[in-house]
Structure formats: structure tokens, C-alpha cells
Amino acid sequence: MSWSILEFLRKNPEELKNNLKRRAIDVSLVDKAVELDKKWRQVLQEVERLRHQHNVLSSQIPKLSGEERKKKIEESKNLLKILEDKEKELEKIEVERDRLLSSLPNLVADDVPNGPDDSYNIPIKFWGKFKVYEGDVEEFLRQTKDANVNYEIIKWKPKGHAEMLEDVLHLGNTLKAAEIAGSRFYYLFNDIVWLDFALLLFAIDYITQQGYTLVLPPYMLRGEVIQSVIDLDTFKDAIYKIENEDLYLIATAEHSVAAMFFKEEIEKDKLPLKFAGISPAFRKEAGAANKDLKGIFRVHQFHKVEQFIFSTPEDSWKYHAELITNAESIFQQLELPYRIVNIASGDLGACAAKKFDLEVWMPAQAKFREMVSCSNCTDWQAFRMKIRYVDRKNNKRGYVHTLNSTAIASTRTITAILENYQREDGVVEVPKVLRKYLEIFPKAPKDYIYPLKNKII
């Protein structure tokens, strides 16, 4: 089984063009790729013909003697030189073709909504009881139109997570962090740090109970590897590079876990392989200059637990459903109300064929905010990383499918807890499911997080 994009290129280039149109990408790239592939196949035929000629000639030489033998040896040398030149030409064309094809985004799944940006994303599910300030009811109903949602109206306006963190609880300081490190960094203290750790422990406890192998991966990857996992040309402003080193800081454990089988083959009967990666995540957020400047929703570093699956092509959609189900279970246990959104074609990102986002309702902001991103990357990453499965019983090889989903991104989930679990007096209730991870530590909060009288710094 060959790479899906290459198959489309050969069998149905017009369909490949339609796919690019759904992402608003220049379709002339397909025409260039078709020409390169046609040229590659022509040169391949020449190479195979020359190889056959050389093999025939080589088999004749041992049977000859004298001048005729010398003549054939010379002829063989000349033919070998021509063959080597043709093989180099073939390799050059193949590299050029594959580089062009690798620059293309993944094929979009049929049931992905068409549209150039996130305004075309379609909510497909709502869960939980939504806490809505009386002045925001109209806006809430606009965002949940045509959905049968359960909500309660509250008469007091919840405070935003940034205000709660710094001015009410006095358990965070982004101003001092900005002074010594720049914007989008933070200091967190005491109960919020315990909350961060409890979220991570809860997520890895739950996900590993679903049969996932826990992994602590490298926090940096070489350029060749990160380029294979993501579209680095597009995301170069989002990824940190180590100065004077061929190393990049990962933006999620997905990157390192995906590369675990870089340039390797996996026995088909070992699939699926399921992992839960835990790591810090480092992001420049260069494209979000004026978004979420306050608080800890959009930051340069945070802790994250990531689900990742290597699958056979025929099973990948089943596992995509499993990943989002796991994520939903985590947020249901946290009792954070959310919606699931089917992401539009123009908002997908190059890697994904289809993506669901889980967005939690933030009552202070009166909007849904992304907490989880769940993608089926089909064979897009696997082709670039040269990760194949081997079916020895049927003598077949093919590219694996890779899938990923957030389990928990700690700081974002903390913002959701601060907005959804706050009381009017500023006290924040600790979600019940997290309490068993805190009770073993004498200094950790148990049931509630109380405001400090004075700031720590």
C-alpha cells in the first residue's frame, strides 16, 4: 500500500485538487507533482531496462574468452556508468517529487465541514450543565442555537481566570514573570501548583487504565525529525529552536511520541500501539500577539498529557472516536461543561485529515474555549517519518496511521476550573475527582482553594 496522497495523484488528480480547494490552497502544485511523477516513472522504466541489459551482459561474460570477453567487459562498464547516471537522475526526480508532495497538507475527510476559517466549525455535541450569568443568556443561546442544552442562570458575574488567579486568590503573578522572562510566562504558587499536578496525575491515571503505555519522551527533537512530524515551514514561528544547535523544543509530547518509530517498521499484529506522553509544552504563540494577553490560557510553557496511537489504516477512524471519548470522559469527571466541534477544512492544520476540538464553557468570558484537540493524521506523518507496518502473513507493507489527542493541558484546564468552580466569595471548589490525588499531601488543598490575604510576591 502506497502513500494515500501519491495514490490520489496517480489515480485521481482532480480529486486531489478538490481536496486542496477545500483548504484554499493553490491547486497548480498538483499539476507540477503529476509532471514530476510522470517523469519519474519514465526514468524508472529506463533504469529497469538498463539493469536488465546489464544483468544479461554480466551473465554472458563468464562464458566468453579473448577479445570478445574484453569487448563485453568494456561494454558492461560503459553500460554500468549510464545506469548509475540514470539512477542518480531517478533519485533526484523522486526527491523533488516527494518534497513537493510533502509540502501538501493531508487529505481532508469527507465529513469535515467546508470553510476557510474557524467560523465554519460545526458544534456536534454539548455536555453538562452550563453556568450562565443573567446578562450573558442571549449570547449563550446564540452560541448554542438549535441545541438542547441544560443551563442555570446566575445573578452574579463570575470573575475571569486572570483576575481570580492574581487579584482574588493571590496565587499567581504574570507581571513579575513578564519582567524577568517576557510576556506569556507566569509564576504559580501553592494550591494552584498542587492543582496542576493533580490534573496531570488524574489524566495519566485514567488514560493508562484504558491500556495506554505511559512515556516520558525527549523534550527536544532534531530538525529532520520535527520537520517530519509537523509542517515546520508553517509552524516555524510557533516552535522554539535552540540557538546554534539542530534541536527544537517540542510543543507537545505528540511530536516526540510520533517519532518513537522514526524510519522503522512495526509488525502489523502489534498494532495498535497506544501511548500517553507527559511533558512540558513550549510554544512561541507568535501568531497570537493580541490574544489572551492576561492570565495563563495562552502561554509559552505548560504541562500536558497527550494521547497517541499508531494504527492500521483500516482501524484509524475507530481509534479517533476512542481518543475523543477518552478526552470527554476526563472532562465529564471534572464536571466541566463543554461542546465538541468538528473543525472546518480551512482551520484543520496540515497534518490532520479530521479534527475534533473539545471546548469548555467559560462563564466569565461567555464563550467556549478550546481545551482538547483530537486529530486523525492518517498516513501524513508516517510517510514523512518513514514508519511502515509489516504484514508478513500476507507479504504486505504500508504506512501506519497516527492519531493524537490532548488528555489534559494543565494551565488551560486550571483557567476552566477557576471560572466554573468559583463562588461569589472568591473561594474555588476543587473538582471532586481530583481530591484523592491531593489528600496524600499534607500541604495540598483538599476541598476548596481559599484566597490569600496577601500576595506572595
From Swiss-Prot:
UniProt record, GO biological process: selenocysteine biosynthetic process; seryl-tRNA aminoacylation
Swiss-Prot/TrEMBL catalytic activity: tRNA(Ser) + L-serine + ATP = L-seryl-tRNA(Ser) + AMP + diphosphate + H(+); tRNA(Sec) + L-serine + ATP = L-seryl-tRNA(Sec) + AMP + diphosphate + H(+)
Keywords carried by this UniProt record: Aminoacyl-tRNA synthetase, ATP-binding, Cytoplasm, Ligase, Nucleotide-binding, Protein biosynthesis
MF (Gene Ontology): ATP binding; serine-tRNA ligase activity
GO cellular component term of the entry, any: cytoplasm
Binding site for L-serine: 252-254, 306, 406
Pathway per the UniProt entry: Aminoacyl-tRNA biosynthesis; selenocysteinyl-tRNA(Sec) biosynthesis; L-seryl-tRNA(Sec) from L-serine and tRNA(Sec): step 1/1
InterPro entries, A to Z: aa-tRNA-synt_IIb (IPR002314), aa-tRNA-synth_II (IPR006195), aa-tRNA-synth_II/BPL/LPL (IPR045864), Ser-tRNA-ligase_type_1 (IPR002317), Ser-tRNA-synth_1_N (IPR015866), SerRS_1_N_sf (IPR042103), SerRS_core (IPR033729), tRNA-bd_arm (IPR010978)
Pfam families per record: Seryl_tRNA_N, tRNA-synt_2b
EC number per UniProt: 6.1.1.11
Subcellular location: Cytoplasm
Catalytic EC class: ligase
Residues reported in the UniProt entry to bind ATP: 283-285, 299, 370-373
Biological function: Catalyzes the attachment of serine to tRNA(Ser). Is also able to aminoacylate tRNA(Sec) with serine, to form the misacylated tRNA L-seryl-tRNA(Sec), which will be further converted into selenocysteinyl-tRNA(Sec).
Domain notes: Consists of two distinct domains, a catalytic core and a N-terminal extension that is involved in tRNA binding.
Similarity comment text for this entry: Belongs to the class-II aminoacyl-tRNA synthetase family. Type-1 seryl-tRNA synthetase subfamily.
Subunit structure: Homodimer. The tRNA molecule binds across the dimer.
PANTHER family: SERYL-TRNA SYNTHETASE
Record-given protein name: Serine--tRNA ligase
Organism: Saccharolobus islandicus (strain M.14.25 / Kamchatka #1) (Sulfolobus islandicus)
